[in-house]
């Protein structure tokens, strides 16, 4: 802006905030620095943060317009340069005090990024250098020179995308070498004295003598543009190349600049060369690149494009050119503003990304680790999105991406870039995200095989404290994830500690190594660190082992309790883990937890040693008598494994063998197999003498013959006796007095053995009845012996089940979310809807239970009040035979004969389980109850009858609606069989003043309606279209909706018409058609106005008639599918279409109204199940051409007919499979090709089943009406078209599995014109002269076609 400004001192210095008082779109946020040339601030704008550069105007006459025009032209030129960020706005006089420049705010520049953690690695530096050269190349190709490239003007986003900004074409090109004032004023904004300016820009100070003289003259203005032209000479490309080289050098030397001002001037004169700084660049290719770029001779510097080509495969990996640059550029576009969208796009492309960056799908690093290191660039994109993700799905997708990429990333990236974000996710508000973050963190840390020097204490100081809160998380799934992964976390932490210790020892033992750096030495010695680690993990393990949810404890045991034993050591494994695990067997309600104990105990016992066998023996015995047979199986397997490992003492082995032998006749197959497994392992472990002397006596009662090879499972299984019958076993086990049963069975056995002379029948009638039941189920003497063999097990199991039942009652009463109605004194009532057979009066008894007085009245109303006022307290005595059987509550019957079972009180229920000879329950006679109680029952009965009647009516309506849909016809009046319209014009109607958008015919074919852009809806009488009258006019016109009427549909016959306009209005009109054709009337009934921003205007509509509801379904341009219930004026349903598939253009409804299909502007066809309002399938046209019109196929339920943009294509798609079944192709282009030499499209379609021979009528932009015979395609023809159109033929062929009916123009015959006789005098063309927008048919005495066109014409044909 002229060198003279450098020497002028401003008369007044104002703060940058003061300049914002005159601009209203920007709100001052904070200052970003201030120099004499520019004051820089950050401001808030409705579109985000912006950088505002303020130039204080000292002279109001200063001409700044030319500079503004230059900056605006620069902005236009750089519009497509994705690595350039020019000023978006320039205000030469934003106020009287200043001119301002505006651009988007980016947080970090390259100077700051170099010194910010995590530090850039080598591949990231190369990527940034590559982008710097790319940005310079983009600018130069656009005809723009930067003029001030430096690290402060290279912006770096959070995902390492480079933006070259603050283009300085307004700054002087040349500077005096003997006066640093200009350099300080224009270029040294950071006050670092760093110089990036090309040496040729410093010239002899003599050329500025004239300007200096001007400055001495007080009358000279601040800037004299004419005298400043020498300083504003043309910027050369080589100047930018030099500056870019200095920036790249500073990038690779960790912020050490190549030149300051004095060094650059010396370099210009050949007295200095920055060799010392260049040698700090370790990469030789980068060093050579920088050396070439800072060549003192500008002619020897190449173009940026040449450097990119030269260093391809050298300084810059090939993957930058082939994949990363084009792929990453898509995220710089404005369309990718959402972090969620970026993550979902990367997840979708993950396979392609890994293939390109790694060359294979496996994490091996065989060829070119540099290719896999390109993933670091992608990781920066992922991590930059993590903190701004909104949806749960996106967060889970991001964690999934990290997990896929982690095996291919370096240790530094995993610890410095990935781990902090995973810990961030561990504090997310969504439990699923917290749980998945913990799992991902565990797996990522397990991949680390070496610990960098900076991360020696990462576990005790960062990771474990960062996730400590998850052990007490409110969500069970989070604690579950912690329990699932804590063993691996502890294992990895111990490995980290050992790696650090080993690394420290190796460094200390190296003879040529200096004193070990304190940073690499862990705090204190190894034992202290290990103890601290043990305490941290132990605290969380104990918390999880004491968790209120059993599933957390179970998961901890199943997911690595053995690894925790190894981590803690033998002493703590016994004191901490085993002591807590033992308590799990006290939970009698959750057999899964008890089973998990026996699954895990083997690993713990193996680590603790055989000393634990005395502790475990009673626990294992308890498992063998568990109430749940699955737990018994797991206990047997645990015993077998412990015996194999030698963890059981020999006396204990024999004791267990005696307990387990009876299981050989247990009815459960798994238990028998488990017992056989234990017996065979014991036989294998002990000597042959012990087998026959100590083991065989236990087995003899259960085998059919003596056996030698007991240690072989198959042998032992083959000689086992048949097990006890399951029915007998279960019935005996459920007996309440099982001890008495076994005493009697034992006496019967003694009698059989001869040791007892007589066995009297049992005195207790209960035992007698039980024995009788067992004998009736087939219990033999052999079965009795087997039951006696299982006596000890069955007795213990019976007691265990009884205890479990008692504890379950206690447990349920305090369980969250469970309401104990009995405890509240509330009696449930069940009413039989079928009148039962009357019982004798003496059996019709009603039991009264006194209820708590504080029961809520609302509950009494729902469940019934059984306590009448002033009920007599004295109860009559009942006979002994009135016994209430368990499970069959006493019944109460009202005067109407409705039976009402009444539940017993808790005391009665409890008494029912106590063995008693006469469990008599007192009942209340019905005669005792006062009349108020009967009135309450009568009221309940009335309400019940009303409910039944309501349900019957509802069921009736649903049945009628179902029958209506099942019997639904395609149309009430289909065309007559063999109908083939001749194309004779019957009526030419020109009442509309603008394009007609839609035609609809009423169900009875009495009327048809048209809507137009002229804002009118016209109703026409079909009967008048037969050509018998001289003039044909519409019978009704409605024009009060406003806007352009885009679509309409008839509702419920001919009486209602729904219309929609582009102004968001939807109206339901009533048509009084009963007096046709005399004086019809039309009037609005209902209306609604859609939100144009939220929904947009309606593009298509249809009517659902489901019997119970009359629903008007309409689709809007913004993707809403709404069902408007016309009977209640509310929405029956609302669906939301994903606009990523394109805007909705049309939709069609299945004839049975079970599903609908929408078509979009991007060629997608999406199906929705209307029963559940869920999307079910989506398919897309191969060319993604716009869907013009959709219709259902009249014969095939899953087919839709779609008219698409171009080639007059109409295709029939099977939405169930996604296949294109049939295509009608009225174009000269090759069938099914995606080329479109024919721009014509079908805008209107009509399809009819036509008595099993479906036909299709199409019309569109070529102004022709075509008749397609879908059964015999060769019989298709053009019904009406423009005069002189060539004749056509139709041929059927199969292309790529799709049937195609193609229209082919016949060759014109060459010869005299009179070869073909004329039918009459030359007639005027009767076809349409503009695009046909819709087509329909109606039937009167014959079939008619009605078409409408864009010029407002409606024509009727026959």
Swiss-Prot record:
Name the record gives this protein: Phosphoinositide 3-kinase regulatory subunit 4
Domain Protein kinase: start-end pairs: 26-324
Cofactor(s) needed by this chain: Mn(2+)
Active site: 148
Lipidation (N-myristoyl glycine): 2
Record flagged with keyword NAD: no
Function: Regulatory subunit of the PI3K complex that mediates formation of phosphatidylinositol 3-phosphate; different complex forms are believed to play a role in multiple membrane trafficking pathways: PI3KC3-C1 is involved in initiation of autophagosomes and PI3KC3-C2 in maturation of autophagosomes and endocytosis. Involved in regulation of degradative endocytic trafficking and cytokinesis, probably in the context of PI3KC3-C2.
Top-level taxon in the UniProt lineage: Eukaryota
Subcellular location as annotated: Late endosome; Cytoplasmic vesicle, Autophagosome; Membrane
Family, per entry: Belongs to the protein kinase superfamily. Ser/Thr protein kinase family.
Name of one Pfam family that matches: WD40
Catalytic reaction annotation: L-seryl-[protein] + ATP = O-phospho-L-seryl-[protein] + ADP + H(+); L-threonyl-[protein] + ATP = O-phospho-L-threonyl-[protein] + ADP + H(+)
Biased composition (Basic and acidic residues): 1315-1326
Binding of ATP, residues: 32-40, 53
Membrane topology listed for this record: Lipid-anchor
SMART domains registered for this protein in UniProt: S_TKc, WD40
Upper classification of the organism: Eukaryota, Metazoa, Chordata, Craniata, Vertebrata
Name of the gene encoding the protein in the UniProt record: Pik3r4
Modified-residue entries (Phosphothreonine), positions: 1316
Region (Disordered), start-end ranges: 1307-1326
Organism: Mus musculus (Mouse)
Ranges: WD repeats: 991-1030, 1040-1079, 1093-1134, 1139-1178, 1182-1223, 1237-1278, 1327-1358
Alphabetized InterPro entries for the sequence: ARM-like, ARM-type_fold, HEAT_type_2, Kinase-like_dom_sf, Prot_kinase_dom, Ser/Thr_kinase_AS, Vps15-like, VPS15-like_hel
Alphabetized PROSITE patterns for the sequence: HEAT_REPEAT (PS50077), PROTEIN_KINASE_DOM (PS50011), PROTEIN_KINASE_ST (PS00108), WD_REPEATS_1 (PS00678), WD_REPEATS_2 (PS50082), WD_REPEATS_REGION (PS50294)
Subunit structure: Component of the PI3K (PI3KC3/PI3K-III/class III phosphatidylinositol 3-kinase) complex the core of which is composed of the catalytic subunit PIK3C3, the regulatory subunit PIK3R4 and BECN1 associating with additional regulatory/auxiliary subunits to form alternative complex forms. Alternative complex forms containing a fourth regulatory subunit in a mutually exclusive manner are PI3K complex I (PI3KC3-C1) containing ATG14, and PI3K complex II (PI3KC3-C2) containing UVRAG.
EC main group: transferase
GO cellular component: autophagosome; axoneme; ciliary basal body; intercellular bridge; late endosome; phosphatidylinositol 3-kinase complex, class III
Alphabetical GO biological process terms: autophagosome maturation; cellular response to glucose starvation; early endosome to late endosome transport; late endosome to vacuole transport; phosphatidylinositol 3-kinase/protein kinase B signal transduction; phosphatidylinositol-3-phosphate biosynthetic process; protein targeting to lysosome; receptor catabolic process
HEAT repeats: 413-450, 458-495, 572-610, 612-648
